């Protein structure tokens, strides 16, 4: 029963004032709200805003530094690629020069070997010709000697010596 009495009393109070009463409580509530807003602004919103601004500045600085580093890295990579390409061209030039030099040396050695072989062939041919001439001269002497011996045996030694 006491519940019903309390409920009826609350309904009576609510019917009188409506949403809120326009008495001294309204300006007091407004002052309390403004004080709460000032206190929250000083203790919560300003430090939180500073922290957020600091974080934004930190992120922005990190992004700028990262972009600068990326730009430097790209420039270094490009310079490295150019240097590498130059080194490759230089290496190809050195290899081509070395191959040309090796071919030149090989051609010179082949020509020298052919010249030496030709000289040895000519020397051998000369020696063969000389030995041939010596053999022919020796053979002629032997033929003359044998012919004389045959003539001496056939005709006699006295007739052959007279000739």
From Swiss-Prot:
Main location: membrane
Upper lineage: Bacteria, Bacillati, Cyanobacteriota, Cyanophyceae, Nostocales
Organism of origin: Trichormus variabilis (strain ATCC 29413 / PCC 7937) (Anabaena variabilis)
A cellular-component GO term for this protein: proton-transporting ATP synthase complex
Sequence intervals crossing the membrane: 28-45
Topology with respect to the bilayer: Single-pass membrane protein
GO molecular function terms listed in the Swiss-Prot or TrEMBL record: proton-transporting ATP synthase activity, rotational mechanism; proton-transporting ATPase activity, rotational mechanism
Record keywords, A-Z: ATP synthesis, CF(0), Hydrogen ion transport, Ion transport, Membrane, Thylakoid, Transmembrane, Transmembrane helix, Transport
Primary role: F(1)F(0) ATP synthase produces ATP from ADP in the presence of a proton or sodium gradient. F-type ATPases consist of two structural domains, F(1) containing the extramembraneous catalytic core and F(0) containing the membrane proton channel, linked together by a central stalk and a peripheral stalk. During catalysis, ATP synthesis in the catalytic domain of F(1) is coupled via a rotary mechanism of the central stalk subunits to proton translocation.
Source domain of life: Bacteria
Protein family (similarity comment): Belongs to the ATPase B chain family.
Assembly notes: F-type ATPases have 2 components, F(1) - the catalytic core - and F(0) - the membrane proton channel. F(1) has five subunits: alpha(3), beta(3), gamma(1), delta(1), epsilon(1). F(0) has four main subunits: a(1), b(1), b'(1) and c(10-14). The alpha and beta chains form an alternating ring which encloses part of the gamma chain. F(1) is attached to F(0) by a central stalk formed by the gamma and epsilon chains, while a peripheral stalk is formed by the delta, b and b' chains.
Protein name (database record): ATP synthase subunit b'
Subcellular location: Cellular thylakoid membrane
Keyword hit for Nucleotide-binding: no
């Amino acid at each position: 029963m006491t519940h019903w009495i309390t409920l009826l009393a609350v309904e009576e109070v609510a019917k009188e004032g409506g949403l809120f009463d326009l008495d001294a409580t309204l300006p007091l509530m407004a002052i309390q709200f403004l004080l709460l807003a000032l206190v929250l602004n000083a203790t919560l919103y300003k430090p939180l805003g500073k922290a957020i601004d600091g974080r934004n500045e930190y992120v922005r600085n990190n992004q700028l530094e990262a972009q600068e580093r990326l730009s430097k890295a790209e420039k270094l990579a490009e310079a490295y690629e150019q240097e590498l390409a130059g080194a490759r061209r230089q290496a190809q030039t050195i290899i081509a020069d070395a191959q040309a030099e090796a071919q030149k040396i090989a051609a010179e050695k082949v020509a020298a070997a052919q010249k030496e072989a030709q000289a040895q062939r000519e020397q051998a041919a000369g020696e063969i010709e000389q030995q041939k001439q010596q053999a022919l001269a020796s053979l002629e002497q032997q033929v003359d000697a044998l012919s004389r011996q045959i003539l001496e045996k056939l005709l006699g030694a006295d007739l052959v010596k007279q000739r």
